[in-house]
Amino acid sequence: MYQYSYDRETGGLLLSDDPQLISKEPRPVYAYELDLLGFNEHWSYKSQNDAPYMWAESNSYIYRGKKIAQVKGGGLYEKPALEVVKDEFGDQVLAEDEELVPVDLKRMSEKNGSMLQVLEQMTVKKIYEVYKRREKQLDCFHVAFSGGKDSVVLLDLVK
């Protein structure tokens, strides 16, 4: 995983070209998850699941670069508790009843376009190098496919 920062303009991520040794692996958070955790008791948002509203790193929820909430506890039969993050003055980091805006995925992709092209080219080159090293030992080249998001990306790269 490469380093990233949060883009307040798009609500998305901006990739950098510095490899990161330990990755936090942010994941997108959609309205369905927000509803389950009770975000609708603090903020308003449209009930759409086409674009994420924010990102989560472990149990922390980040909206446009600010950690606004975290979850604690929870289990198979109990709902986790949502804790709204407050600043040093005791005020919520994101004002109560503020409307959440979805991540602008198109603009985020445009801003990361050159970095994504470099990553794609490097990955295709590595795949090709492995193929060339093994092509005399094999009569066909298989790529594992689980159907997950990583497999879908890999399938696109090896076409």
Spans of model-derived segments:
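Catalytic cores of secreted/periplasmic lytic hydrolases that degrade extracellular macromolecules
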Residues: G148
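RNA-binding accessory domains that recognize and position tRNA/RNA substrates
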Residues: M1-A144, V152-K159
